A protein has these predicted regions:
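Extreme N-terminal leader/targeting segments of oxidoreductases
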Residues: 1-25, 43-51, 550-591
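Glycine-rich Rossmann-fold phosphate-binding loop(s) that bind the pyrophosphate
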Residues: 29-35
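A short, Lys/Arg-enriched amphipathic alpha-helix followed by its capping loop at the start of a domain
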Residues: 37-50, 236, 240-242
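Conserved FAD-binding subdomain of flavin-dependent enzymes
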Residues: 72-113
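Rossmann-like flavin
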Residues: 100-207, 218-220
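C-terminal segments that line or cap access tunnels to active or ligand-binding sites in enzymes
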Residues: 207-221, 283-285, 290-515, 521-538
Protein backbone atom coordinates (compact mmCIF):
# COMPACT_ATOMS: atom_id res chain seq x y z
CA UNK A 1 0.00 0.00 0.00
CA UNK A 2 1.29 3.45 -0.87
CA UNK A 3 -0.06 7.01 -0.81
CA UNK A 4 -0.52 9.26 -3.80
CA UNK A 5 -2.03 12.57 -4.84
CA UNK A 6 -3.24 13.92 -8.14
CA UNK A 7 -5.39 12.69 -11.00
CA UNK A 8 -2.98 10.12 -12.43
CA UNK A 9 -3.57 7.65 -9.62
CA UNK A 10 -7.07 8.86 -8.80
CA UNK A 11 -8.46 8.09 -12.26
CA UNK A 12 -6.64 4.78 -12.72
CA UNK A 13 -8.31 1.37 -12.52
CA UNK A 14 -6.11 -1.17 -10.74
CA UNK A 15 -5.52 -4.61 -12.18
CA UNK A 16 -7.09 -7.59 -10.45
CA UNK A 17 -4.71 -8.71 -7.68
CA UNK A 18 -3.11 -12.13 -7.98
CA UNK A 19 -4.90 -14.91 -6.13
CA UNK A 20 -7.99 -12.92 -5.18
CA UNK A 21 -10.37 -15.56 -6.57
CA UNK A 22 -9.12 -17.98 -3.93
CA UNK A 23 -9.73 -15.62 -1.03
CA UNK A 24 -12.72 -14.83 1.18
CA UNK A 25 -13.39 -11.91 3.50
CA UNK A 26 -15.21 -11.56 6.81
CA UNK A 27 -16.04 -8.07 8.06
CA UNK A 28 -16.83 -7.61 11.74
CA UNK A 29 -19.53 -4.95 11.94
CA UNK A 30 -21.40 -3.04 9.24
CA UNK A 31 -20.53 0.54 10.09
CA UNK A 32 -19.09 2.95 7.58
CA UNK A 33 -15.55 1.53 7.86
CA UNK A 34 -16.61 -2.07 7.27
CA UNK A 35 -18.98 -1.20 4.43
CA UNK A 36 -16.21 0.87 2.82
CA UNK A 37 -13.82 -2.06 3.07
CA UNK A 38 -16.45 -4.28 1.46
CA UNK A 39 -16.90 -1.77 -1.37
CA UNK A 40 -13.16 -1.65 -2.01
CA UNK A 41 -13.02 -5.46 -1.93
CA UNK A 42 -15.52 -5.78 -4.77
CA UNK A 43 -14.60 -2.64 -6.73
CA UNK A 44 -10.80 -2.45 -6.64
CA UNK A 45 -9.68 -5.85 -5.33
CA UNK A 46 -12.36 -7.44 -7.57
CA UNK A 47 -13.23 -10.12 -5.04
CA UNK A 48 -16.40 -12.02 -5.85
CA UNK A 49 -19.27 -10.62 -3.81
CA UNK A 50 -20.48 -14.00 -2.61
CA UNK A 51 -17.09 -14.48 -0.91
CA UNK A 52 -17.53 -11.29 1.15
CA UNK A 53 -19.38 -11.77 4.46
CA UNK A 54 -20.55 -8.90 6.67
CA UNK A 55 -21.17 -10.03 10.27
CA UNK A 56 -23.48 -7.58 12.05
CA UNK A 57 -24.80 -8.03 15.59
CA UNK A 58 -27.82 -5.78 14.98
CA UNK A 59 -30.77 -6.43 12.67
CA UNK A 60 -29.83 -3.46 10.44
CA UNK A 61 -26.53 -2.09 9.06
CA UNK A 62 -24.84 1.26 9.57
CA UNK A 63 -23.22 1.29 13.00
CA UNK A 64 -23.02 4.88 14.25
CA UNK A 65 -24.42 6.21 10.95
CA UNK A 66 -28.07 5.80 11.81
CA UNK A 67 -31.35 7.49 11.05
CA UNK A 68 -34.56 5.56 11.61
CA UNK A 69 -38.18 5.96 12.55
CA UNK A 70 -38.99 3.64 15.44
CA UNK A 71 -42.69 2.83 15.44
CA UNK A 72 -43.04 3.12 19.19
CA UNK A 73 -40.95 6.27 19.83
CA UNK A 74 -40.48 8.27 16.61
CA UNK A 75 -37.62 9.59 14.48
CA UNK A 76 -34.09 9.14 15.82
CA UNK A 77 -30.70 10.43 14.65
CA UNK A 78 -28.00 9.73 17.21
CA UNK A 79 -25.68 12.09 15.36
CA UNK A 80 -24.94 13.84 12.10
CA UNK A 81 -22.00 14.08 9.74
CA UNK A 82 -20.12 17.20 8.64
CA UNK A 83 -18.22 16.70 5.38
CA UNK A 84 -15.26 18.43 3.76
CA UNK A 85 -14.38 18.87 0.08
CA UNK A 86 -11.02 17.23 0.76
CA UNK A 87 -12.26 13.94 2.15
CA UNK A 88 -10.19 12.27 -0.54
CA UNK A 89 -11.00 8.63 0.22
CA UNK A 90 -14.68 9.32 0.74
CA UNK A 91 -15.12 10.94 -2.65
CA UNK A 92 -12.97 8.27 -4.29
CA UNK A 93 -15.50 5.74 -3.03
CA UNK A 94 -18.77 7.60 -3.52
CA UNK A 95 -17.95 8.43 -7.15
CA UNK A 96 -18.81 4.75 -7.74
CA UNK A 97 -21.89 4.33 -5.51
CA UNK A 98 -25.21 4.97 -7.30
CA UNK A 99 -27.63 7.32 -5.58
CA UNK A 100 -30.77 5.70 -4.24
CA UNK A 101 -32.71 8.73 -5.54
CA UNK A 102 -31.51 8.28 -9.14
CA UNK A 103 -29.33 5.31 -10.02
CA UNK A 104 -28.09 7.14 -13.15
CA UNK A 105 -26.09 9.43 -10.87
CA UNK A 106 -23.65 8.71 -8.08
CA UNK A 107 -23.77 9.76 -4.44
CA UNK A 108 -20.90 12.14 -5.23
CA UNK A 109 -22.80 13.70 -8.16
CA UNK A 110 -25.86 14.20 -6.00
CA UNK A 111 -23.86 15.65 -3.13
CA UNK A 112 -21.76 17.92 -5.37
CA UNK A 113 -24.73 19.41 -7.19
CA UNK A 114 -26.67 19.88 -3.97
CA UNK A 115 -23.91 21.76 -2.18
CA UNK A 116 -23.13 23.87 -5.25
CA UNK A 117 -26.77 24.91 -5.63
CA UNK A 118 -27.35 25.35 -1.89
CA UNK A 119 -24.02 26.19 -0.21
CA UNK A 120 -23.82 25.92 3.55
CA UNK A 121 -23.41 28.91 5.83
CA UNK A 122 -24.77 29.95 9.20
CA UNK A 123 -26.56 33.22 9.92
CA UNK A 124 -26.44 32.72 13.70
CA UNK A 125 -23.64 30.64 15.21
CA UNK A 126 -24.53 31.14 18.88
CA UNK A 127 -27.23 32.57 21.13
CA UNK A 128 -27.47 34.00 24.63
CA UNK A 129 -30.31 35.32 26.79
CA UNK A 130 -32.94 32.89 25.51
CA UNK A 131 -32.58 33.14 21.77
CA UNK A 132 -30.74 36.41 21.24
CA UNK A 133 -27.90 36.40 18.72
CA UNK A 134 -24.64 36.23 20.66
CA UNK A 135 -23.00 38.30 17.90
CA UNK A 136 -19.83 36.31 17.72
CA UNK A 137 -19.73 37.98 14.28
CA UNK A 138 -17.18 35.62 12.83
CA UNK A 139 -14.53 36.58 15.37
CA UNK A 140 -12.25 34.11 17.13
CA UNK A 141 -11.43 36.50 19.98
CA UNK A 142 -7.91 35.19 20.51
CA UNK A 143 -5.30 37.30 22.24
CA UNK A 144 -1.71 37.20 21.01
CA UNK A 145 -0.90 34.95 23.98
CA UNK A 146 -3.73 32.57 23.04
CA UNK A 147 -2.60 32.50 19.41
CA UNK A 148 0.90 31.57 20.55
CA UNK A 149 -0.51 28.72 22.69
CA UNK A 150 -2.24 27.33 19.60
CA UNK A 151 0.95 27.81 17.57
CA UNK A 152 2.98 25.94 20.18
CA UNK A 153 0.62 22.96 20.04
CA UNK A 154 0.62 23.08 16.24
CA UNK A 155 4.43 22.88 16.16
CA UNK A 156 4.94 20.25 18.88
CA UNK A 157 6.07 16.83 17.58
CA UNK A 158 3.67 13.96 18.22
CA UNK A 159 6.07 12.45 20.74
CA UNK A 160 5.67 15.54 22.90
CA UNK A 161 1.89 15.09 22.95
CA UNK A 162 1.58 11.47 24.02
CA UNK A 163 -0.88 11.14 26.93
CA UNK A 164 -1.19 14.94 27.14
CA UNK A 165 -4.47 16.80 27.61
CA UNK A 166 -5.58 19.93 25.81
CA UNK A 167 -5.35 21.81 29.11
CA UNK A 168 -1.63 20.98 29.21
CA UNK A 169 -1.27 23.48 26.35
CA UNK A 170 -4.25 25.85 26.54
CA UNK A 171 -5.19 28.07 29.48
CA UNK A 172 -8.14 30.43 29.87
CA UNK A 173 -6.82 32.72 27.12
CA UNK A 174 -7.90 30.02 24.66
CA UNK A 175 -10.57 28.20 26.65
CA UNK A 176 -12.68 31.32 27.21
CA UNK A 177 -12.46 32.48 23.59
CA UNK A 178 -14.95 32.25 20.74
CA UNK A 179 -12.42 30.00 19.05
CA UNK A 180 -12.81 27.31 21.71
CA UNK A 181 -16.58 27.66 21.75
CA UNK A 182 -16.67 27.14 17.98
CA UNK A 183 -14.20 24.27 18.15
CA UNK A 184 -15.45 22.24 21.08
CA UNK A 185 -19.10 22.36 20.01
CA UNK A 186 -18.42 21.67 16.34
CA UNK A 187 -16.15 18.68 17.01
CA UNK A 188 -17.35 17.64 20.53
CA UNK A 189 -13.98 18.14 22.21
CA UNK A 190 -13.72 18.50 25.98
CA UNK A 191 -10.93 20.33 27.81
CA UNK A 192 -9.45 17.05 29.10
CA UNK A 193 -9.24 15.37 25.71
CA UNK A 194 -6.16 14.50 23.68
CA UNK A 195 -3.74 17.28 22.80
CA UNK A 196 -2.40 15.00 20.07
CA UNK A 197 -5.80 14.74 18.42
CA UNK A 198 -6.33 18.49 18.82
CA UNK A 199 -3.09 19.07 16.93
CA UNK A 200 -4.15 16.63 14.21
CA UNK A 201 -7.40 18.54 13.77
CA UNK A 202 -5.62 21.89 13.58
CA UNK A 203 -3.24 20.60 10.94
CA UNK A 204 -5.86 18.60 9.01
CA UNK A 205 -8.30 21.49 8.64
CA UNK A 206 -5.92 24.45 8.50
CA UNK A 207 -7.41 25.32 5.08
CA UNK A 208 -10.84 25.72 6.69
CA UNK A 209 -9.96 27.95 9.65
CA UNK A 210 -11.64 30.95 8.05
CA UNK A 211 -14.83 28.94 7.50
CA UNK A 212 -15.25 27.74 11.09
CA UNK A 213 -17.17 30.71 12.53
CA UNK A 214 -19.93 30.61 9.90
CA UNK A 215 -19.63 26.97 8.76
CA UNK A 216 -18.87 27.86 5.15
CA UNK A 217 -16.24 25.14 5.52
CA UNK A 218 -18.93 22.44 5.77
CA UNK A 219 -21.07 20.42 3.42
CA UNK A 220 -23.99 18.15 4.25
CA UNK A 221 -25.94 15.33 2.63
CA UNK A 222 -29.57 15.77 1.58
CA UNK A 223 -31.00 13.33 4.10
CA UNK A 224 -29.78 11.75 7.31
CA UNK A 225 -26.54 9.79 7.23
CA UNK A 226 -28.27 6.40 7.03
CA UNK A 227 -30.39 7.15 4.00
CA UNK A 228 -27.79 9.29 2.20
CA UNK A 229 -24.71 7.11 2.78
CA UNK A 230 -25.39 3.69 4.32
CA UNK A 231 -28.36 2.57 2.22
CA UNK A 232 -26.67 3.37 -1.13
CA UNK A 233 -23.58 1.40 -0.03
CA UNK A 234 -25.64 -1.60 1.09
CA UNK A 235 -27.61 -1.60 -2.17
CA UNK A 236 -24.35 -1.38 -4.14
CA UNK A 237 -22.85 -4.31 -2.23
CA UNK A 238 -26.00 -6.41 -2.55
CA UNK A 239 -25.74 -5.87 -6.31
CA UNK A 240 -22.39 -7.68 -6.19
CA UNK A 241 -23.85 -10.53 -4.13
CA UNK A 242 -22.16 -9.58 -0.85
CA UNK A 243 -23.54 -11.68 2.02
CA UNK A 244 -25.01 -9.78 4.99
CA UNK A 245 -25.40 -11.82 8.18
CA UNK A 246 -27.52 -9.86 10.65
CA UNK A 247 -28.12 -10.77 14.30
CA UNK A 248 -24.61 -12.25 14.21
CA UNK A 249 -22.45 -11.18 17.12
CA UNK A 250 -18.70 -11.82 16.94
CA UNK A 251 -17.70 -12.83 20.48
CA UNK A 252 -14.01 -13.55 19.91
CA UNK A 253 -11.31 -13.90 17.28
CA UNK A 254 -8.40 -16.29 17.86
CA UNK A 255 -4.91 -15.53 16.55
CA UNK A 256 -1.69 -17.47 16.11
CA UNK A 257 1.16 -15.02 16.71
CA UNK A 258 4.09 -17.45 16.80
CA UNK A 259 7.32 -16.91 14.90
CA UNK A 260 6.76 -13.29 13.98
CA UNK A 261 3.79 -14.10 11.75
CA UNK A 262 0.32 -13.14 12.97
CA UNK A 263 -2.69 -14.98 11.60
CA UNK A 264 -6.36 -14.93 12.54
CA UNK A 265 -7.36 -18.58 12.88
CA UNK A 266 -10.98 -18.61 14.11
CA UNK A 267 -14.00 -16.35 14.49
CA UNK A 268 -16.47 -17.22 17.26
CA UNK A 269 -19.98 -15.94 16.64
CA UNK A 270 -23.39 -15.99 18.25
CA UNK A 271 -25.92 -16.19 15.42
CA UNK A 272 -29.57 -15.89 16.43
CA UNK A 273 -28.54 -17.18 19.86
CA UNK A 274 -26.58 -20.18 18.54
CA UNK A 275 -22.81 -20.44 19.10
CA UNK A 276 -20.83 -21.09 15.92
CA UNK A 277 -17.19 -20.92 14.82
CA UNK A 278 -15.60 -20.04 11.50
CA UNK A 279 -12.17 -21.58 10.93
CA UNK A 280 -9.77 -19.39 8.96
CA UNK A 281 -6.82 -19.98 6.65
CA UNK A 282 -4.37 -17.40 5.31
CA UNK A 283 -6.77 -16.92 2.39
CA UNK A 284 -9.62 -15.94 4.73
CA UNK A 285 -9.27 -12.22 5.43
CA UNK A 286 -10.77 -10.65 8.55
CA UNK A 287 -11.55 -6.93 8.86
CA UNK A 288 -12.19 -6.01 12.49
CA UNK A 289 -14.04 -2.93 13.70
CA UNK A 290 -12.49 -2.66 17.17
CA UNK A 291 -14.07 -0.60 19.95
CA UNK A 292 -17.14 1.47 19.18
CA UNK A 293 -18.23 5.02 19.87
CA UNK A 294 -21.93 4.11 20.05
CA UNK A 295 -21.48 0.97 22.15
CA UNK A 296 -23.87 0.99 25.15
CA UNK A 297 -26.02 3.70 23.55
CA UNK A 298 -29.55 3.82 24.89
CA UNK A 299 -32.73 5.53 23.76
CA UNK A 300 -35.43 7.06 25.88
CA UNK A 301 -38.72 8.44 24.66
CA UNK A 302 -40.98 11.43 25.05
CA UNK A 303 -41.80 10.38 28.60
CA UNK A 304 -38.79 8.30 29.68
CA UNK A 305 -35.09 9.19 30.05
CA UNK A 306 -32.40 7.37 28.11
CA UNK A 307 -30.80 5.16 30.78
CA UNK A 308 -27.10 5.59 31.48
CA UNK A 309 -25.65 2.06 31.21
CA UNK A 310 -21.88 2.26 30.69
CA UNK A 311 -21.09 -1.28 31.85
CA UNK A 312 -19.20 -3.01 29.04
CA UNK A 313 -21.20 -5.99 27.81
CA UNK A 314 -19.92 -9.33 26.59
CA UNK A 315 -20.03 -9.51 22.84
CA UNK A 316 -19.87 -5.76 22.31
CA UNK A 317 -17.13 -3.89 20.51
CA UNK A 318 -15.14 -3.06 23.64
CA UNK A 319 -15.34 -6.59 25.01
CA UNK A 320 -14.21 -8.02 21.67
CA UNK A 321 -11.27 -5.62 21.46
CA UNK A 322 -10.21 -6.52 25.01
CA UNK A 323 -10.17 -10.22 24.09
CA UNK A 324 -8.20 -9.51 20.93
CA UNK A 325 -5.74 -7.14 22.64
CA UNK A 326 -4.94 -9.77 25.27
CA UNK A 327 -3.42 -11.94 22.53
CA UNK A 328 -0.68 -9.57 21.31
CA UNK A 329 0.69 -6.13 22.36
CA UNK A 330 0.40 -4.81 18.79
CA UNK A 331 -3.39 -5.14 18.94
CA UNK A 332 -3.79 -1.96 21.01
CA UNK A 333 -4.92 -0.96 24.48
CA UNK A 334 -8.72 -0.53 24.61
CA UNK A 335 -8.80 0.50 28.25
CA UNK A 336 -6.97 3.72 27.42
CA UNK A 337 -10.21 4.81 25.76
CA UNK A 338 -13.07 3.18 27.67
CA UNK A 339 -11.83 3.35 31.26
CA UNK A 340 -14.06 6.24 32.39
CA UNK A 341 -17.29 6.98 30.52
CA UNK A 342 -17.78 10.11 32.63
CA UNK A 343 -15.01 11.59 30.47
CA UNK A 344 -16.39 10.40 27.14
CA UNK A 345 -20.19 10.67 27.23
CA UNK A 346 -22.63 13.15 25.82
CA UNK A 347 -26.27 13.06 24.84
CA UNK A 348 -28.29 13.89 21.79
CA UNK A 349 -32.01 14.16 21.17
CA UNK A 350 -34.17 14.19 18.06
CA UNK A 351 -37.06 16.64 18.30
CA UNK A 352 -39.86 16.29 15.75
CA UNK A 353 -42.30 19.20 15.56
CA UNK A 354 -45.96 18.19 15.33
CA UNK A 355 -47.54 21.55 14.51
CA UNK A 356 -46.51 25.14 13.68
CA UNK A 357 -46.19 26.60 17.19
CA UNK A 358 -42.41 26.15 17.55
CA UNK A 359 -41.56 27.19 13.99
CA UNK A 360 -41.50 31.01 14.48
CA UNK A 361 -38.86 30.70 17.21
CA UNK A 362 -36.66 28.62 14.90
CA UNK A 363 -37.13 31.14 12.08
CA UNK A 364 -36.18 34.05 14.30
CA UNK A 365 -32.81 32.48 15.10
CA UNK A 366 -31.85 30.84 11.80
CA UNK A 367 -33.34 33.66 9.67
CA UNK A 368 -34.54 31.17 7.07
CA UNK A 369 -37.66 29.22 6.14
CA UNK A 370 -37.10 25.73 7.59
CA UNK A 371 -39.62 24.22 5.16
CA UNK A 372 -37.77 25.41 2.04
CA UNK A 373 -35.84 22.17 1.55
CA UNK A 374 -32.64 24.20 1.62
CA UNK A 375 -30.03 24.99 4.28
CA UNK A 376 -31.73 25.98 7.55
CA UNK A 377 -29.36 26.66 10.45
CA UNK A 378 -26.28 25.86 8.35
CA UNK A 379 -24.70 23.87 11.17
CA UNK A 380 -25.17 23.92 14.91
CA UNK A 381 -26.41 26.88 16.93
CA UNK A 382 -24.69 26.85 20.31
CA UNK A 383 -26.45 28.16 23.41
CA UNK A 384 -23.48 29.85 25.05
CA UNK A 385 -25.14 30.34 28.42
CA UNK A 386 -26.58 26.82 28.67
CA UNK A 387 -25.70 24.72 31.69
CA UNK A 388 -25.68 21.65 29.44
CA UNK A 389 -23.68 23.49 26.74
CA UNK A 390 -26.57 22.78 24.40
CA UNK A 391 -26.25 23.02 20.62
CA UNK A 392 -28.92 22.33 18.02
CA UNK A 393 -29.33 22.16 14.26
CA UNK A 394 -31.83 21.71 11.47
CA UNK A 395 -30.34 20.32 8.31
CA UNK A 396 -32.25 20.41 5.06
CA UNK A 397 -35.82 19.18 5.60
CA UNK A 398 -37.13 16.61 5.28
CA UNK A 399 -34.26 14.80 7.03
CA UNK A 400 -36.07 11.50 6.43
CA UNK A 401 -37.51 10.58 3.07
CA UNK A 402 -40.82 9.54 4.65
CA UNK A 403 -41.00 12.55 7.00
CA UNK A 404 -44.28 14.49 6.69
CA UNK A 405 -43.68 17.79 4.89
CA UNK A 406 -45.30 19.81 7.67
CA UNK A 407 -42.94 18.43 10.33
CA UNK A 408 -39.35 19.39 11.20
CA UNK A 409 -36.65 17.17 12.69
CA UNK A 410 -34.28 19.05 14.99
CA UNK A 411 -31.07 17.51 16.33
CA UNK A 412 -29.98 18.67 19.79
CA UNK A 413 -26.92 17.71 21.80
CA UNK A 414 -25.42 18.58 25.16
CA UNK A 415 -21.79 18.12 26.18
CA UNK A 416 -22.40 18.39 29.94
CA UNK A 417 -24.87 15.63 30.78
CA UNK A 418 -24.21 15.77 34.53
CA UNK A 419 -24.96 19.48 35.00
CA UNK A 420 -28.39 20.89 35.91
CA UNK A 421 -30.36 22.64 33.20
CA UNK A 422 -31.39 26.28 33.30
CA UNK A 423 -35.15 25.75 33.03
CA UNK A 424 -35.34 22.05 33.86
CA UNK A 425 -33.30 22.03 37.04
CA UNK A 426 -31.83 18.56 36.66
CA UNK A 427 -29.03 16.89 34.70
CA UNK A 428 -29.67 16.16 31.05
CA UNK A 429 -29.03 12.43 31.60
CA UNK A 430 -31.98 12.29 34.01
CA UNK A 431 -34.41 14.01 31.64
CA UNK A 432 -37.21 12.60 29.53
CA UNK A 433 -37.53 13.66 25.92
CA UNK A 434 -40.20 16.15 26.90
CA UNK A 435 -37.94 17.72 29.53
CA UNK A 436 -35.04 18.05 27.08
CA UNK A 437 -37.41 19.71 24.66
CA UNK A 438 -38.53 22.09 27.42
CA UNK A 439 -34.93 23.12 28.06
CA UNK A 440 -34.40 23.74 24.34
CA UNK A 441 -37.64 25.71 24.03
CA UNK A 442 -36.55 27.87 26.96
CA UNK A 443 -33.27 28.68 25.22
CA UNK A 444 -34.90 29.56 21.88
CA UNK A 445 -37.16 32.09 23.57
CA UNK A 446 -40.54 30.40 24.04
CA UNK A 447 -42.49 32.16 26.85
CA UNK A 448 -42.11 30.20 30.06
CA UNK A 449 -45.84 29.72 30.55
CA UNK A 450 -46.09 27.97 27.15
CA UNK A 451 -43.01 25.76 27.35
CA UNK A 452 -44.43 22.66 29.00
CA UNK A 453 -47.54 22.55 26.82
CA UNK A 454 -45.48 22.96 23.64
CA UNK A 455 -43.02 20.25 24.67
CA UNK A 456 -45.90 17.90 25.47
CA UNK A 457 -48.19 18.56 22.52
CA UNK A 458 -46.25 20.29 19.75
CA UNK A 459 -43.20 18.04 19.64
CA UNK A 460 -42.03 14.48 20.09
CA UNK A 461 -38.53 14.14 21.53
CA UNK A 462 -36.34 11.04 21.73
CA UNK A 463 -33.20 11.29 23.91
CA UNK A 464 -30.09 9.21 23.33
CA UNK A 465 -27.31 8.59 25.87
CA UNK A 466 -23.91 7.62 24.43
CA UNK A 467 -21.39 6.76 27.17
CA UNK A 468 -18.44 6.22 24.81
CA UNK A 469 -19.18 8.68 22.03
CA UNK A 470 -15.98 10.66 22.69
CA UNK A 471 -13.82 7.69 23.72
CA UNK A 472 -11.49 8.15 20.75
CA UNK A 473 -10.61 11.65 22.03
CA UNK A 474 -9.08 10.33 25.25
CA UNK A 475 -5.33 11.07 25.65
CA UNK A 476 -3.25 8.34 24.05
CA UNK A 477 0.28 7.32 23.17
CA UNK A 478 1.89 5.31 20.37
CA UNK A 479 0.52 1.77 20.22
CA UNK A 480 -2.75 2.45 22.05
CA UNK A 481 -4.53 2.11 18.72
CA UNK A 482 -3.42 -0.84 16.59
CA UNK A 483 -2.05 -0.18 13.13
CA UNK A 484 -4.59 -0.93 10.43
CA UNK A 485 -2.45 -3.91 9.45
CA UNK A 486 -0.10 -4.72 12.35
CA UNK A 487 3.44 -5.78 11.55
CA UNK A 488 3.50 -9.47 10.66
CA UNK A 489 -0.26 -9.72 10.03
CA UNK A 490 -1.08 -11.91 7.05
CA UNK A 491 -4.88 -12.09 6.95
CA UNK A 492 -6.44 -9.43 9.16
CA UNK A 493 -6.78 -5.69 9.59
CA UNK A 494 -8.34 -3.25 12.04
CA UNK A 495 -10.91 -0.71 10.88
CA UNK A 496 -12.57 2.44 12.10
CA UNK A 497 -11.97 5.15 14.64
CA UNK A 498 -9.74 3.08 16.92
CA UNK A 499 -7.28 1.97 14.22
CA UNK A 500 -4.15 4.01 13.59
CA UNK A 501 -3.35 5.76 10.33
CA UNK A 502 -1.15 8.75 9.55
CA UNK A 503 -2.25 12.37 9.89
CA UNK A 504 -6.01 11.91 9.57
CA UNK A 505 -8.56 12.85 12.23
CA UNK A 506 -11.04 10.67 14.07
CA UNK A 507 -14.80 11.23 14.39
CA UNK A 508 -15.07 11.76 10.63
CA UNK A 509 -16.57 9.80 7.77
CA UNK A 510 -13.23 10.14 5.99
CA UNK A 511 -11.31 8.39 8.77
CA UNK A 512 -13.61 5.37 8.68
CA UNK A 513 -13.50 5.12 4.89
CA UNK A 514 -9.73 5.65 4.79
CA UNK A 515 -9.13 2.76 7.18
CA UNK A 516 -11.29 0.50 5.01
CA UNK A 517 -9.41 1.49 1.87
CA UNK A 518 -5.96 1.12 3.42
CA UNK A 519 -6.87 -2.27 4.90
CA UNK A 520 -8.04 -3.72 1.58
CA UNK A 521 -5.20 -2.24 -0.43
CA UNK A 522 -2.62 -3.59 2.03
CA UNK A 523 -3.92 -7.13 2.49
CA UNK A 524 -4.68 -7.66 -1.20
CA UNK A 525 -1.78 -5.63 -2.59
CA UNK A 526 -4.03 -3.47 -4.77
CA UNK A 527 -1.69 -1.62 -7.12
CA UNK A 528 -3.14 1.88 -6.95
CA UNK A 529 -2.35 4.76 -4.63
CA UNK A 530 -4.48 5.51 -1.59
CA UNK A 531 -5.11 9.28 -1.66
CA UNK A 532 -2.92 10.94 0.95
CA UNK A 533 -4.50 13.19 3.56
CA UNK A 534 -4.98 16.60 1.96
CA UNK A 535 -1.71 18.46 2.37
CA UNK A 536 -2.86 21.96 3.32
CA UNK A 537 -0.61 21.86 6.39
CA UNK A 538 2.34 21.91 3.96
CA UNK A 539 0.91 24.76 1.85
CA UNK A 540 2.40 28.12 2.85
CA UNK A 541 -0.67 29.92 1.48
CA UNK A 542 -3.01 28.02 3.81
CA UNK A 543 -0.69 28.60 6.76
CA UNK A 544 -0.49 32.35 6.13
CA UNK A 545 -4.24 32.64 5.58
CA UNK A 546 -5.03 30.71 8.78
CA UNK A 547 -2.53 32.74 10.82
CA UNK A 548 -4.21 36.01 9.88
CA UNK A 549 -7.78 34.72 10.23
CA UNK A 550 -7.15 33.17 13.64
CA UNK A 551 -6.03 36.65 14.75
CA UNK A 552 -9.24 38.19 13.34
CA UNK A 553 -7.36 39.90 10.53
CA UNK A 554 -4.61 41.48 12.63
CA UNK A 555 -1.30 41.65 10.81
CA UNK A 556 1.88 40.23 12.34
CA UNK A 557 3.24 43.75 12.53
CA UNK A 558 0.48 44.46 15.07
CA UNK A 559 1.56 41.71 17.45
CA UNK A 560 2.61 42.63 20.95
CA UNK A 561 6.32 41.90 21.31
CA UNK A 562 9.41 43.27 23.05
CA UNK A 563 11.27 46.15 21.43
CA UNK A 564 14.05 43.84 20.26
CA UNK A 565 11.46 41.70 18.47
CA UNK A 566 9.93 44.69 16.72
CA UNK A 567 13.36 45.86 15.57
CA UNK A 568 14.18 42.38 14.27
CA UNK A 569 10.88 42.21 12.37
CA UNK A 570 11.46 45.66 10.87
CA UNK A 571 14.89 44.56 9.66
CA UNK A 572 13.52 41.31 8.22
CA UNK A 573 10.77 43.14 6.34
CA UNK A 574 13.37 45.43 4.79
CA UNK A 575 15.23 42.42 3.42
CA UNK A 576 12.16 41.09 1.58
CA UNK A 577 11.11 44.40 0.03
CA UNK A 578 10.39 43.98 -3.66
CA UNK A 579 10.53 40.17 -3.52
CA UNK A 580 8.01 37.41 -4.17
CA UNK A 581 7.97 36.82 -0.42
CA UNK A 582 6.73 40.35 0.22
CA UNK A 583 4.06 39.96 -2.48
CA UNK A 584 2.86 36.72 -0.89
CA UNK A 585 2.71 38.20 2.62
CA UNK A 586 0.74 41.19 1.34
CA UNK A 587 -1.64 39.00 -0.69
CA UNK A 588 -2.62 37.15 2.49
CA UNK A 589 -2.70 40.33 4.61
CA UNK A 590 0.13 39.15 6.84
CA UNK A 591 1.79 42.56 6.47
Amino acid sequence: MYYSSGNYEAFATPKKPDGVDGKSAYLVGSGLAALSAACYLVRDAQMKGERVHVLEKDPIPGGACDGYKYQDIGYVMRGGREMDNHFECMWDLFRSIPSIEDENHTVLDEYYWLNKADPNYSLCRATVNRGEDAHTDGKFGLSDKAAMEIMKLFMTPDEGLYDKKITDFFDDEVLNSNFWMYWRTMFAFENWHSALEMKRYLQRYIHHIGGLPDFTALRFTRYNQYESMILPMVKYLEGFGVQFHYNTKVTNIAFDCAGGKKQATRIDVLHDGQEESIDLTENDLVFITNGGCVENSTLGSQNTPAPYKPEIKEGGGWDLWRKIAAQDPSFGHPDKFCYDPELSNWMSATITTLDQRIVPYIKKICKRDPFSGKVVTGGIVTVQDSGWLLSWTLNRQQQFRDQPKDQLCVWVYGLFTDKPGDFVKKPMRDCTGKEICMEWLYHIGVPEDQIEDMAANSANTVPCMMPYIDAFFMPRTAGDRPDIVPEGAVNFAFLGQFAETKRDTIFTTEYSIRTGMEAVYTLLNVDRGVPEVWGSVYDIRCLLDATVKLRDGRKITDMEMPLVGKLAMKEALKKIEGTEVEKLLKEYNVI
